Structure formats: C-alpha cells, structure tokens
Amino acid sequence: MRYLPLTPEDRVEMLGAIGVKSIDDLFVDVPVSARRDAPVDLPHHAGELDVEREMAGLARRNRAAGEGPFFCGAGAYRHHVPATVDHIIQRSEFLTSYTPYQPEIAQGTLQVLFEFQTQVAALTGMEVANASLYDGSTGAAEAVMMAQRVTRRNKAVMSGGVHPHYVGAIETLAHAAGVATQALPAAVDAEDAVIAAIDQDTACVVVQTPNVFGTVTDVSKIAEAAHAAGALLIVVTTEAVSFGLLKSPGEMGADIAVAEGQSIGNGLNFGGPYVGLFACKEKFVRQMPGRLCGETVDADGKRGFVLTLSTREQHIRRDKATSNICTNSGLCALAFSIHMSLLGETGLRQLAAVNHQKALALRDALKAVPGVEILTPRFFNEFAIRVPGKAAEVVEILAAHGVIAGVPFSRLDAKAGLDDVLLVAATETTLDIDIPVFAKALTKVFAQ
C-alpha cells in the first residue's frame, strides 16, 4: 500500500465532513493555558555519533547501582541476573511481548506462559495463577476489583504496611470503579489496626509481607478476621525472593496473592518494565483478571496450549469483562520463568538465605552507629531505621561520597510524618566491604 500524505484540500474536506472549520476547533475543550501553540525549541538535527555522545553524557549524570555501595529497595531490588536469562529471551522466537492470539503458531510462547503460571502458583501457595500482569501495584489494584466482583461489596481496607505507591494505584482504579478505600496510617507493625478496621461492608483486606518497612508478618490472624466478616484477604509481596524462606500467602490463608516479580530474572530497569504475579483460589478463577493459559488436547490427541477463560474486554462485553489488560510485559515474565528454572527450589532457598544473612550483617553494623534506631523487628532483606534529622538529607550527603544509602520514606509518602525514617536493603549483590563503608559514612555524617 502506498503512503499518500494529506493535501490541504484533503484536510478541508475532512474537517467539513465532521462539521468543524479548522483543526483548532477539535481542541476547544483543552484550556488555553494547557496548549502549546508556539514551536518547541529543539536543537538542530545531528548525526548518529553526535547523538550517541549526547546520550552518553546524560547517562553519566546518573550513578549506576553497581558503581558503589548500594542499599536501595522499597519495592525495586538489585539482584544478579544470570547471563543465560538475557541470552534466551533474545531468541527470535521469544523476543516479543505480544499476546499469542494464534495458538497454532505460538505453542512455544504459550507453553512458557503455562510453565510460568505453574511456578507462580507454587511460589505463592495458591491453586491457580494467570499469565502475569503489568506489575505488582496494578496487580494489587486488579485484586481489589476482583474482590468487589466476588463479594459484591464496595470497601477495601489497606494495611498501614502496604507500599504507598501500591496504595496510590489501588485508590486510582478503585475510585473509577466505585470502591471506597480505607488506607490505614503508615505503621511498621500494622496487624492489630487492620483487624480492627474490618467490618461487614469490607470486600477485601490488603496486607503486605514483608511490608514496606520490611516487617515480616504471619497474616493468618488477619485472614481469620477477614473471612469471619465475609471479606477476602489479598496478600501483596514486593520482594519475590522472600518466597524462598517465608510462608507462602496460601499457607497463611490468602484468597488472592499479588507480587512484584522484578527481583527474579529482571534488572531494576530504571523503574520498569516489571512483571506482576497474580494467583488466587480456584473457586475465584472466573473472576481473575488477565490472561490464563491452559493445557488441552487437539483433534489428533496431541497436547497443546491455548488461552482460556479470556474474559478481557477485547473478547466479551466490556461491562462483563474481568479486566482490560492488553499486551503486557510478557518478555519479563519469560525472564522470570527462566531464572526460576535455573534456580530451582533449592537454589531459591539458598538465594533467599544469603539475602537474609546480608541484611542481618547490615542491621548489626548500623545498630552500632550512634543515633541510629532499628525500627523493624522481623525482616527478610530490608528494614527501616530512624536517623537524626531528615533521612533525605542524609541520603544526599552520602550520595556525594559514593554511597547510595537507601530510600527515605518521605519520598514514598511525604504526608506520613516519617521524615527521619530510612529504608535500607541488602541482597546477594551487596559486598561484605560495602556494609562497614556505609556504617562509617553514617557515623561521620552524624558526628558533624
């Protein structure tokens, strides 16, 4: 097909067909203050080499995670990704994030998704898992919508330990769906407050373990309280490696388990793309959002894989759809599945143990720093500390000395009144020498 550009006469004819005089008439509902009528002042075009140099200069303004001591977490964790993962996902058969709509030519991709679902169900201790969602936060929001459909109630209670960004995503989607949300105040240990907030109008209770402060909680009591009130329990996990050591959501009575899978097979990716893990009890499968890959038998009796229970709005009436998720980061799900296959159950357990040991060493070192208070009593590979003054200022000072000290809680929730709280994490990538360097740097800052 040839490309035929629009002529001025074509534009006049098209505008007349829709009943307007000019292109500007199409944007009268946009406030004048929000319009940009003047040309954008962009630099002149440049050759490829010059552009590469310019981009490299911009990149040098950032400090890469591996350039020095690095203790950031708060929902995005630096882990080692084996070279095998990148090698396999770059095969031409896999290098696409697109939905495998035609099963007859996508059996390999569909089988990978089926294996991914099996791995996620095993990790979360649930009966069924979908083929991934965009990320952990949107997965949590989808879980709340699912709970509304299952219970026919319109209230979601969110623990004070749920990551503030997840709370924001839930509130955004819930508002449009007519679901009332009750976000409890941020708290290191929020179990009692959550139980007290459950009532007969509650559709679901959203808890996180390890929570945003790193606290590990057995949420079995919360599950009992939620179920007694007829509500569902949604358990969120932002650090998937923790599944190697801790009780699974299913073991603790979760109805829906949501997790961010970035920690396995995926880098920090400057905040995205990530991969959302979503699993639930089988009795709720018809209300589960996203795609589900199933195993079947063809007309010749051969095993095959297909997308099943596709209740997305692209397939059925919008008001009956369980989600509107479209092409998501399927390649990230593949990376997750490959890394999990390389680790195996024993490897994941060993990796999780190393993470916990590194965090214990970090805790012991920081506990000895005058002025530092350890706030998190039980943790996996991340915990919160209280520092003298504002944590954000401490982070900036240490960054100037080459130490990325962690994430100030105020950057996640500026209104929580926790300006002196710093979240620090350690993984298998944390060098033993990095820990005393961090502790000594903190000591010097507080001594000034």
Swiss-Prot record:
List keywords of the entry alphabetically.
Oxidoreductase
Q: Name one GO molecular function term.
A: glycine dehydrogenase (decarboxylating) activity
What is catalysed by this protein? Answer: N(6)-[(R)-lipoyl]-L-lysyl-[glycine-cleavage complex H protein] + glycine + H(+) = N(6)-[(R)-S(8)-aminomethyldihydrolipoyl]-L-lysyl-[glycine-cleavage complex H protein] + CO2
| A Pfam family of this chain | GDC-P
EC no.?
1.4.4.2
**PANTHER family per the UniProt record, alphabetical:** GLYCINE CLEAVAGE SYSTEM P-PROTEIN, GLYCINE DEHYDROGENASE (DECARBOXYLATING)
Q: What is this protein called?
A: Probable glycine dehydrogenase (decarboxylating) subunit 1
